[in-house]
A protein has these predicted regions:
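Metal-centered catalytic cores of metalloenzymes
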Residues: 52-73, 317, 333-355
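Short, basic, glycine/proline-bearing loop/turn elements
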Residues: 114-123, 165, 236, 240-242
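Acidic, histidine-bearing metal-coordination/catalytic regions of metal-dependent phosphoesterases
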Residues: 1-113
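Residue-level marker for buried hydrophobic side chains located in beta-strands
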Residues: 114-116, 147-149, 191, 237, ...
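Active-site metal-binding loops of divalent metal-dependent hydrolases
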Residues: 118-121, 151-154, 194-197, 241-243, ...
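Beta-strand-turn-beta hairpins that frame and shape the catalytic cleft
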Residues: 104-114, 223-237, 286-289
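Core catalytic region of metal-dependent phosphoesterases/phosphodiesterases
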Residues: 108, 122-222
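Conserved beta-sheet core of the metallophosphoesterase superfamily
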Residues: 207, 232-237, 242-346, 350
Length: 355
């Protein structure tokens, strides 16, 4: 990629591209806006810069008694549109391929932990905001402990559900203030958008708040590979919810993903405000796979009460520890704690041990 194209190179690129700005910019290795700025400067200096050959002169239409010239099309020519779609696909492809497994380099030696926050719903009157305050403080006070969020940060009532703001004392504007306070409380290893969050559509405010915190935010799934200094890799597959359900086994979704999917070390999901856990062995690689569902900080839920859903919450969160000093196939490489203070104490114990 050249740093600066000459005027002659720009003219030749436009000629080769038959005047298509997007194609010429791509050939020159500059963005289209930069190319247009250069073209305007060249025209101001007297250069004759060709228009797109695809913008054919508009012929007048003769109706006998009168004629008129049709208006120019208000959209880009099809050839430029196709070039734009090609570039958009390449951007999409680059993002999707990179998202299949996101590498995260762990820079500190020894054991680490992840506190997976269940559905926060921080603006709901039934949310235990004091517990959120304690648990974010625990993350900040514990060396090697990272925070993670499985989604539904706020109620985010939209559409016909917007009427439900009348049933809570927190306004929509206040909800985003609390969400920002929550996200800025600690550093996040990953953040997932829940179904409530995604009701915002493409303009999801959480995406921008997370970006300000340099947090990894994914709207549906974050599959990450924690790579430790000793070469060990531990994979975490986090979703707001894994496909599949069973009245007999609330951990069915993440278990199904483990057995029929990517064979990662840890699967974590939220969504249904229930705690569940199952452990499996991958017979091929020998690793132990942990399938977890975390509940919610929305302790008192009128919807659940009205529908007769039972209380299946062990804790609003789960804390998992990873001990990289153990072999990859060791069954205790990953441990799950439902009481975060107990998990943090165990993590401190592991970190005191010689690496």
């Amino acid at each position: 990629m050249q740093l600066k194209a000459t005027d002659e190179q720009i003219l030749q690129a436009l000629k080769n591209a038959k005047g298509i700005r997007a194609a010429a910019a791509n050939a020159l290795g500059i963005n289209e806006r930069t190319l247009m700025a250069r073209i305007n400067k060249m025209r101001a200096r007297g250069y004759s810069v060709p228009d797109s050959t695809y913008r054919q002169p508009i012929a007048a239409i003769d109706h006998g008694d009168y004629e008129f010239t049709p208006l120019p099309d208000d959209d880009v020519p099809i050839e430029e549109l196709i070039e734009q779609r090609k570039r958009k696909f390449l951007h999409k492809q680059e993002h999707e391929e990179a998202s299949k497994l996101i590498p995260i380099k762990v820079k500190i030696p020894g054991a680490v932990g992840i506190l997976h926050f269940g559905d926060p719903h921080v603006d709901d009157d039934g949310c235990d905001i004091a517990a959120i305050e304690r648990h974010t403080a625990l993350v900040n006070a514990t060396e090697g402990l990272f925070a993670a969020n499985v989604g539904d940060t706020t109620n985010n009532w939209t559409g016909r559900l917007a009427r439900l703001y009348a049933d809570q004392t927190t306004s929509a504007a206040q909800a985003w203030k609390i969400a920002e306070w929550f996200i800025k409380r600690c550093k996040w290893l990953y953040m997932i958008g829940g179904n409530h969050d995604l009701w915002s559509g493409a303009g999801d405010p959480l995406r921008w708040i997370a970006k300000q915190q340099d947090a990894l935010y994914k709207s549906s799934e974050a599959r990450i590979a924690l790579r430790f200094p000793n070469g060990l890799e531990v994979r975490v597959n986090a979703r707001h919810d894994h496909a599949g359900s069973s009245i007999w086994n609330p951990a069915h979704g993440p278990m199904k993903a483990a057995i029929m999917g990517t064979r990662d070390h840890l699967y974590v999901a939220g969504h249904k405000h229930e705690s569940a856990y199952s452990v499996l062995k991958d017979p091929i690689s020998g690793i132990t796979m942990h399938a977890c569902k975390v509940a919610s900080y929305k302790i008192y839920d009128r919807y659940a009460k009205d529908r007769g859903f039972r209380d299946n919450s062990l804790s609003p969160c789960a804390l998992t520890t990873i001990n990289p000093s153990l072999p990859p196939e060791h069954p205790d490489l990953v441990k799950v704690f439902w009481e975060p203070t107990e998990g943090a104490e165990y993590l401190r114990f592991l970190r005191r041990k010689p690496v």
